[in-house]
C-alpha cells in the first residue's frame, strides 16, 4: 500500500491550495492589505485533518486567532502610551488615587513598573486607550508641564534666578513676548510658562529593518520593560523634578507655585504662544534642551519617547516691592556703566592734551554717607548720587590757558603707603590725609615740610581739622598757587612755627576790580576731611565738637544758592570758631576769573589777631601736655624698677616688709643726678660698695621705740650757730642715699607717717650706738668709752680700723673750737651714726613718709668723711629745723657730693668704723653731746 495515494485527492482539492482559494485570508491578492506580522504567526495553529467537513471550522478558528493577536498588539501599544503618560505626570504632579472594588488602591503594573493609577489621568487619555494602532490610528501624545502665574496675588511675582543669583520677573518676559498684531481684538495676557514637553509617538516604520518588525510579541513587551525603567530614572534627573521636590518641602503657609500638566494631541490646536523656548533672563546658554529617552520596536513601528525641557528652573515667588527694588539697583548699576571710562592715569605720566582733567572723576573715590562725601573731583553735591549726576555738567573750558599739569594720583592704582604718596607734583585738589598729633611725645623734625620762600604756614586755617582743597579745573590755578604741599602732621611742624606763628596771609582770591590775585600761603596742612570745620580745644563746647566729629557740621550739607560754593555762616569772636569759608579757601583760589565774593575776603586785623591767639593757645597747650606726659611715662617706668629693687633688698631685711618706704637699701648711685622718690635705688655701675653690701647682723636686738625716745631727749652740745650750715653739709655727704625734696626756706607742717609710728623690733644685727643710755651718764665719758670699744673690737677689719681712726682724729680737731652748744641745749637731738632708723624721733616721720633711706648716715659711709666733707657738713642742719617742729624734718641729701672726699665703703666697713662715726658725732647735730 502506498501511503501517498491517499493524500493525492486532498492535495488536488482546490480548497487546500493556498494560491487558488479566493476565500482564504492568506490569498496573495490580500497580502498587501495584511500586516507582515500575520504571515508568520507566533503561535502554530494546526488545523484539523479529519476531513473536508472540518475545513470550514478550521478556517474560522484561524480567523479568531489572528483577531486575538491583533488585539494583543493594540493593547501593548495603547498601554505604552498610557503608562508613559502616567509615569511622567505622577513624577511632576500629585494625582488623585483610584480604588478597585475591594477598596484598595488600583495600581498599574504594566511593563513591570508599579504605579498608582488615577482615574483623572485615564479620562484625559481616553483617545489613546481606544485607538486602533494596527489600523494606523496612533496620534502622538504630548504632555506639557507648566507653571501658571494667574493664581498669584497682586503683590506677588514669579521670578527666575539666573546663574549669578539675580532675580528676573517672569511676567515681564511673558508680556514682552505677547504678540501685538491684532489691534482690535486684544488677546489675553499669557500666564503660563512651559517647563517640559514630552512626546510619545510611533516612529517611522521605514527606519526599522523589516526583520525587527516580525519579532514575537513577548519580545516586544520585554524590550519595552527596559525602556520604561530608563524613563523612570530620567524623569528624576531633570530640573522639573528638582523644582517639584523643593516645593514639596516648603511649609504650608509658604506661597509657591505647583506644577501643572496638560495632555495634547499632536493634531490638536496649540496655544498661540509657545513659552517653552521663551527667554526669561539674558543668557548666552541655550534655553531648552532635547533628550531622546529611547525606543522599542513593535509590529507597527518603533515606539519612541522624547522630551524638550527648560534648563533653568530656579523659580520662586517673591514680593513685588522687593523685586522692584532690585530693578532700581540694576538701573543704578547700568547708570554707572553707561559712559565708558578710560584708564585712570598715574602721577608722572605724559602731559594731558585736554584742559579739564577732572571732568569725569573716578567713581571709586565717591564714598561715605550722605553727609560726609569725599571724592577726588570737585564738590558736586551733598550726596553721592547727586554728585555723580552733577559730574556730567562740569564745565570743560577755562578762561585762563596754562601749561598742562600732571594728573593727581589715582588712589585705586597707586596703592603705596602714605609716605610714598608725598609728592611735590601733586595737584591742588588731591585728596589728602588728616592732620594727626601725639600729645605724649614731641614730634621729630625729620618729617618737617619742605622750606618755602613764604616762611611758615599761615595759622588762619585750622590746624586741628585742616582744610581740603577742591577745584573745578587744575589749569585755572595760577602758577603762584601751584606750590608743593606735603601732608604734614602737627608734631612735625618746625619749632619756629610752633613758638611764634606768623600773621595769616590772605587767600588768593581774584578780585573783580583787579586781575592779579592776592598772595596765598605757600604751605598748607590739608586733609581728606577738610570739608569739616576746624576744631579747637580752647574752651569750646563739647556739643559742637561732637557734631563736627560725627559729620553733622559737614560743609557739604549747606550749598549757598547761586554761588556754587559752600558757606556756613560768619565767624565769631576770638574765643569762637572762624567762618568755614577759610576751610574751603583752596576751592576759592580756583574761582579767580569769577565774581569776587566779599564774604570770603576777611582780612581785617581783628580776625588775624583772634586766629593768632587761638593758634598760640592751641600749640602751647600741647607743648605743656608733652612735658606732663613725659614725666608720667618716666614715673611709670620708675615705679616698676622700684618694685624690683625693693624686692631684692627685702631679702636682707627679712623682718621688714619689702614695699615699705625706707627698707630698700641702696649702696651706690650715679653722682650728680638727682633721684626722685620714685627712682629705683639701683647702682648704675658696679662698685666696691655693691660687691660687699651684705650686712652682718651681730648686735643685740633692741626696740626702736626705746631708741627713739632716748634720741629725742638729747641736746646738741659743742656746736655754734655758725657751724649749723657746715654740719648739715657733712651729714649730706655722709648719707648713704639721696632722698631729694624740694628745698624750702622754712619748715612746713607735716603729719607723721603711720608707718613710722609702728613699733617693730628690728633684727639683732642693727647696733644701737646711742639709743639706750642713762640720762645722768656724762656724754663725754660715754662717748670715750664707746670710741675705745670700737677701736679695740676684735672683729674690726684693717680698713674699718683706719676709718675709725681717721674719724676720731677729725672729731678731736673739731672739739678744739669753742663750745657754743649752750645756746641750743633745748633742741632735740638725734643720732645719725646709728645703723637703725628713728621711729618716733624728731625726723622719723619725714624719713619714713618720703620713702627715704633710714638713718645710716655715718654708719654706712663712715669713712667717707675727710676734711672736705666736714667743711660741707652744715648745709642743712638738723637741729636748726627740728627746733621749730619735732615731727617735721624734710631731709635733702646731695648725691653729687657722695664720695667727694674719699672712696665709698661697704656696710661692713662702715659698721667696723662705728667708733670713728661716733667721734664725728660729737660735733654733729645727729650724735653730738
Swiss-Prot record:
Polar residues: bias regions: 8-29, 368-385, 412-437, 476-487, 551-566, 749-761, 830-847
Keyword Cytoplasm (UniProt): yes
Biased composition (Acidic residues): 723-735
Short name of one Pfam family: ATG13
Alphabetical UniProt keywords: Autophagy, Cytoplasm, Protein transport, Transport
Subcellular localization(s) per the UniProt record: Cytoplasm; Preautophagosomal structure
Keyword Acetylation on entry: no
Biased composition (Low complexity): 635-656, 855-871, 912-929
Basic and acidic residues bias spans: 55-66, 600-612
A GO term from the CC aspect: cytosol
Disulfide feature: none
Coiled-coil regions, chain positions: none
BP GO annotations: mitophagy; piecemeal microautophagy of the nucleus; protein localization to phagophore assembly site; protein transport
Molecular function GO labels: protein kinase regulator activity
Basic residues biased stretches: 702-714
Quaternary structure annotation from Swiss-Prot or TrEMBL: Interacts with ATG1 to form the ATG1-ATG13 kinase complex.
PANTHER family, per the entry: AUTOPHAGY-RELATED PROTEIN 13, PTHR13430
Protein family according to the UniProt entry: Belongs to the ATG13 family. Fungi subfamily.
Function of the molecule: Activates the ATG1 kinase in a nutritional condition dependent manner through the TOR pathway, leading to autophagy. Also involved in cytoplasm to vacuole transport (Cvt) and more specifically in Cvt vesicle formation. Seems to play a role in the switching machinery regulating the conversion between the Cvt pathway and autophagy. Finally, ATG13 is also required for glycogen storage during stationary phase.
UniProt protein name: Autophagy-related protein 13
Organism expressing this protein natively: Phaeosphaeria nodorum (strain SN15 / ATCC MYA-4574 / FGSC 10173)
Lineage of origin: Eukaryota, Fungi, Dikarya, Ascomycota, Pezizomycotina
